[in-house]
Every structure is written in C-alpha cells, then in structure tokens.
C-alpha cells in the first residue's frame, strides 16, 4: 500500500521529520545551553528527586504485606515509580508502609521505628486492619495506626490489590511534589508546608454521580 508522510510545511526545506519543525540555531553556545542547563526553582527540583526516589521501610503485619510484595514482581514492576529499594533500617528509609493488623503490643515498636526515621518521612496505611482495625474490634487490636503515628495515605481493602498500593504511591508522589520549605531559618513559619490531600471519594464524587452506564463485573 502506498503512503506518504505529510510535513508541517510542504514547501519547507528544513523539515527533517514529519510533524516536527526544525529550527536553525545560529549561536552554538545557545544550542549547548538549551541542551545542558535546566532553569527552575530549587524546591521543585528537590521535591522531584524525593518523589521519584522513595525508599520504603516495609512493616508487614498480616496478609496485606503479601499483596504489597506482589507489586515488586515483574508483573507490576513498582520500580517504575522509584520505590523498589527496600531498606532494612528505618534510619535509611523515608516511607513506612504499615500493612496488616496492628496489635497493642506491636504499637510501641512501630512508634519507635517511626521516630528513628529521618525527616522528611511519610506513612502509608495499607488495608482495613491498619486503617481502622478491620473486623478485629477487640481489646488487643489498635483501631487504626493513626492513633499513634501520622498517616499520609490510606489504602482501603481486605486485602487491597497491588494496583491499589501503586496508586497510593502515585498519590503520595503528587503530594510530595507540592511540599514547600520555609525561606530561611528566621523568615516564615518553620516546618514543612504539606498540601492538603483530598480524599479520592470526594474527588471522584461528581464523576461517579454522572455515570449512566454501569460496567459488568467482567469489565472491572
């Protein structure tokens, strides 16, 4: 079958590739600067590096941890998000993933490990048991890890799928990219300015209300 490639300007002599305009750069210095120099804000560059190189400290307590480990396999390849470097020590990690049921005897251990992590640090609560105690409404189970440590992202499910864990990583990366630091040690409020993360239920409420055709279970 005969085919042709249409250029942006059919009469142009300097169009090397289709749909791409080739510009002639007269100054070689300007050409090298455009290739090697990036102009931007410092906190944007720092946040870009942090959100794409998260080092998780996994704290598996129950079956949710099995789903988390599944995301490290070749099928899901969580390395695409830069979060595949598991650390054995909390002093080398900046993300703690609490996956599973948190018992009362385990809460002080999690608290101590969280305190050993260096700033900036984030926490993901994975699964219904870690979020709210799940089905274990008894004296020996903590009704949510947010009772003693701050949580940035909650993953619902019993247990949640590996895709849910990867979605939580992307939401956390989006939040890290919006963080801001004070201008100096004496100007402005000290600490990290973190963006207010809107719950997915509220963010997608309008989209779900507007749905008219429901998908079959085979299409989900």
Swiss-Prot record:
Species this chain originates from: Salmonella arizonae (strain ATCC BAA-731 / CDC346-86 / RSK2980)
Classification lineage: Bacteria, Pseudomonadati, Pseudomonadota, Gammaproteobacteria, Enterobacterales
Cofactor: [4Fe-4S] cluster
Protein name per the record: NADH-quinone oxidoreductase subunit B
Main subcellular location: membrane
Summary of subunit composition and partner proteins: NDH-1 is composed of 13 different subunits. Subunits NuoB, CD, E, F, and G constitute the peripheral sector of the complex.
NCBIfam families: nuoB_fam, PRK06411.1
Highest taxon of the lineage: Bacteria
InterPro entries the record matches: NADH_UbQ_OxRdtase-like_20kDa, NADH_UQ_OxRdtase_20Kd_su
Details of cofactor binding: Binds 1 [4Fe-4S] cluster.
Name of the gene this protein is made from: nuoB
EC number: 7.1.1.-
Gene Ontology terms describing biological process: aerobic respiration; electron transport coupled proton transport
GO molecular function terms listed in the Swiss-Prot or TrEMBL record: 4 iron, 4 sulfur cluster binding; iron ion binding; NADH dehydrogenase (ubiquinone) activity; NADH:ubiquinone reductase (non-electrogenic) activity; quinone binding
